Curated annotation (Swiss-Prot):
Keywords, in A-Z order: Acyltransferase, Cytoplasm, Iron, Metal-binding, Transferase, tRNA processing
Protein name per Swiss-Prot or TrEMBL: tRNA N6-adenosine threonylcarbamoyltransferase
HAMAP family: TsaD
Superkingdom in the source lineage: Bacteria
EC number: 2.3.1.234
Catalytic activity line of the entry: L-threonylcarbamoyladenylate + adenosine(37) in tRNA = N(6)-L-threonylcarbamoyladenosine(37) in tRNA + AMP + H(+)
Record's signal peptide: none
Pfam families linked to this entry: TsaD (PF00814)
Length: 364
């Protein structure tokens, strides 16, 4: 069975995994032999958000230990894997460089193919780790701190973004509202926790209207919460934090659910995949399951450990590319931004355009 060692350092998690597949290509059923994640949440909480310089330095310190733990968990040596996969875009440049340099070092030392992986494609592949019988085509609702997108997965490696946020990503909106309510960082889990005790109908909030049927906009919702908080404070009233959190969460998750289900129906797709850090939200998971059930759609929601950033999803995507004969040049660089349509440039079969001179040097 093929085995890929994967590294993920795009933001504030240092992660390493070993992934294999039970079914030979073109069938694809990946599974993880190991997955180790070292989170920096507590480190960044004091700053109210991720500090790029702090994140990259922490990756440098942590990566060797996480790598060793993942290999021990899998019962393997680096020499026994078939390829090295690594997140190279999008993300924090300094953090990405740490992972890429580590991956290049291993690829050169052990003479292994290097496979650069787009972080968002990794999130798509978390669904295949969760349910091995999942096959494209399907529609993915990807919701995280930096991205909110509806992605039509037509086939392995063939993606079309059919809906996106016009401003704040869902996770960003959660963080900003949590900050307004004094709930701390990260905001998503805090809002989710408080909302369980609140009345979601107490404060009607705007859903945000955009012309495109599947795009979203959360800046208006965030501003409405700000004005509500200011109004209550001016009146000298105690903030009903649970009710505000519940009202905000209900509004945001309703928008995401309605657009995802409508888009899947319009495209004639029978399967919906929910992934990304915000997929851990209990209200969103419940709403999407119920809405999909009413429409006769299948819903795939990975376990929480696969929704947040991890290296297993990067390994699954990397393994898919390796099975397709796609490998990256050692001149591979990193990029803070890259659309899914840029994925072919990561591989030599795609022209190998994603080189150090275009994205910042990461060559050894």
């Amino acid at each position: 069975m093929p085995r890929v060692l994967a590294i993920e350092t795009s933001c504030d998690e240092t992660a390493v995994a070993v992934v294999t597949a039970d079914v030979a290509w073109p069938g694809f059923a990946p599974r993880q032999l190991s997955s180790v994640v070292a989170s920096q949440i507590d480190l960044h909480a004091a700053y109210g958000g991720v500090v790029p310089e702090v994140a990259s330095r922490q990756h440098v310190e942590t990566l060797p230990f996480v790598l060793e733990a993942a290999l021990q968990q899998a019962g393997l040596e680096v020499a026994e894997v078939d390829a090295i996969a690594v997140t190279c875009a999008p993300g924090l440049v300094g953090s990405l460089l740490v992972g890429l340099m580590g991956a290049k070092t291993l690829a050169l030392l052990y003479d292994k193919p290097l496979i650069g992986v787009h972080h968002l494609e990794g999130h798509l592949f978390s669904g295949f780790l969760a349910e091995p019988d999942l096959r494209p085509p399907c529609l993915c609702l990807l919701v995280s701190g930096g991205h909110t997108s509806l992605i039509w997965m037509k086939d392995y490696g063939d993606y079309q973004t059919v809906g996106r946020t016009r401003d704040d990503a869902a996770g960003e909106a959660f963080d900003k509202v949590a900050r307004l309510l004094g709930l701390g960082y990260p905001g998503g889990p805090q809002i989710d926790r408080w909302a369980q005790q609140g009345d979601p109908q107490r404060f009607p909030l705007p859903e945000g209207k955009v012309e495109h049927p599947y795009d979203t906009s959360f800046s208006g919702l965030k501003t409405a919460v700000l004005r509500l908080v200011q109004q209550l404070q001016q009146q000298g009233r105690e903030l009903p934090i649970a009710d505000i959190a519940a009202s905000f969460q209900a509004c945001l998750t309703h928008v995401l659910t309605e657009k995802a289900v409508a888009c899947a129906e319009a495209l004639g797709l029978s399967t919906l995949l929910l992934t990304g850090g915000v997929a851990a939200n209990r209200e969103l998971r419940a709403r999407l399951r119920e809405a999909a059930r009413q429409k006769g759609l299948r819903v795939v929601i990975p376990p929480l450990a696969l929704c947040t950033d991890n290296a297993a999803m990067i390994g699954a995507a990397g393994l898919c590319h390796w099975l397709r004969g796609e490998v990256s040049p050692l001149e591979l660089g990193v990029a803070s931004r890259m659309p899914l349509e840029g994925i072919p440039s990561l591989y030599m079969d795609g022209g190998g355009a994603h080189r150090e001179e275009q994205t910042g040097s990461a060559a050894l």
